[in-house]
Amino acid sequence: MDLLVVGGGGREHAIIKKLKENPVVETIYALPGNGGIAADAVCVPQISATDIGAIVDFAVSHAVGFAVVAPDDPLALGCVDALHAAGIPCFGPDARAARIESSKVFAKDLMKKYHIPTAQYEVFDTSAAALAYLKTASFPPI
């Protein structure tokens, strides 16, 4: 089976190293990959991890049997959703679930709504509003 791993960081390299141990795996493609990953997978540096259309086209044209999407940006952009829609089984959260990592405001609002302990926070649209808030903050701002 041919696999696709989207990304080019250390996390993706570790995933590729473990996937290589499976005797069912024939070829692993890394989009875009990196110099270190090139020893363990076929890197495709001309396709960005955020070019969802190109990733899906590549996966379909190379008959990829399974994909792994790890970086935050492609997850937030819906890479898993698009691969699933194209019939490619995929490991990684869909865009809706990825919001908890890709949007700090969403994550903080979710924690507040469900009473999950988290540091105090406020959200601002302007730097002036943020500076005004800091003058009255009752906690040590970091």
Where are these regions (language model features)?
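ATP-binding N-terminal substructure of ATP-dependent carboxylate-amine bond-forming enzymes
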Residues: 1-96, 128
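Active-site nucleotide/adenylate-binding loops and adjacent lid/helix of ATP-dependent enzymes
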Residues: 4-5, 101-142
